[in-house]
């Protein structure tokens, strides 16, 4: 007799099966266990359970349901931009071959990453605004924390510079404000590094500036002439980026414009439909 195939478990509509959600509090996202974890048959929503280690001792470990307090703390500590709290690699839509290659490389980085190992390659995503670079960075940090318990941190370059200046004004030593950046397993900097370089820890980067020789794409900051990445950061730092990173071009249409046009098209269609069904005046 053929055994019946067990019915697939329904995926939670709130968390999509991840077991956690992000709640926005002021200007940051706080990870919290989803209500669906209360029904976990292993930990009953506690997030921790006892398991035997390789020596036969009972140890307290995090449950895979999503309610593990340590994992929630790691996710909160990512400091992801609030607009990108729900962005995942699985939800990244690649509209061009370059975006597809970048997505595959981002996924491979997560799959192959070994916590604590030194000498792992860094990544630098190069692309015009709106092509999904921050989405990739956020999705990678999120998966690394959720799947592998990796300590990560997202920093926006110019805000980081502001924090550094503030630290100096308050009399902090360079070691005091650099230590949090040195300690994390993976650091993501949006918009361009020697403290990470010397520690042998990988860094995820994104920039709007093109590599030298890139055709059909240029970028210039307000009031400045167009520059490529080497001109922007200088030959020394550009050379170090080549040594540290695999450089990936994330080329494609500006997704902010694409989504804006799609919203306008939907609104126009809705208006036309409403006018077509409106009763005629007598």
Language-model-detected regions and their locations in the chain:
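N-terminal pre-Walker A segment at the start of P-loop NTPase domains
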Residues: 90-114, 279-282
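Conserved adenine-nucleotide phosphate-binding loops and their immediately adjacent elements
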Residues: 78-91
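Short glycine-rich substrate-engagement loop in P-loop NTPases that contacts/grips substrate
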Residues: 97-106, 141, 145-184
């Amino acid at each position: 007799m053929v055994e019946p195939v067990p019915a697939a478990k329904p995926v939670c509509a709130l968390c999509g099966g991840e077991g956690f959600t992000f709640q926005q509090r002021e200007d940051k996202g706080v990870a919290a266990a989803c209500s669906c974890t209360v029904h976990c048959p292993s930990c009953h929503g506690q997030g921790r359970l006892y398991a035997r280690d390789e020596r036969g001792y009972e140890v307290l470990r995090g449950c895979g349901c999503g309610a593990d307090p340590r994992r929630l703390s790691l996710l909160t500590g990512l400091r992801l931009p609030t607009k990108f709290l729900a962005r995942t690699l699985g939800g990244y839509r690649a509209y061009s071959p370059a975006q597809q290659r970048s997505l595959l490389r981002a996924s491979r980085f997560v799959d192959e990453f070994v916590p604590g190992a030194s000498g792992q390659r860094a990544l630098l995503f190069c692309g015009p605004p709106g092509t999904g670079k921050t989405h990739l960075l956020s999705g990678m940090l999120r998966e690394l924390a959720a799947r592998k318990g990796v300590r990560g941190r997202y920093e926006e370059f110019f805000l980081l510079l502001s924090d550094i200046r503030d630290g100096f004004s308050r009399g902090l030593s360079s070691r005091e404000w650099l230590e949090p950046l040195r300690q994390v397993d993976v650091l993501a900097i949006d918009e361009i590094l020697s403290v990470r370089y010397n520690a042998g820890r990988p860094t995820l980067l994104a920039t709007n500036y093109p590599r030298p020789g890139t055709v059909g794409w240029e970028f210039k900051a307000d009031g400045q002439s167009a520059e490529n990445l080497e001109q922007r950061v200088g030959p020394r730092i550009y050379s170090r980026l080549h040594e540290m990173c695999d450089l990936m071009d994330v080329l494609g249409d500006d997704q902010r414009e694409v989504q804006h046009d799609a919203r306008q098209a939907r609104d126009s269609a809705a208006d036309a439909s409403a006018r077509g069904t409106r009763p005629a005046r007598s």
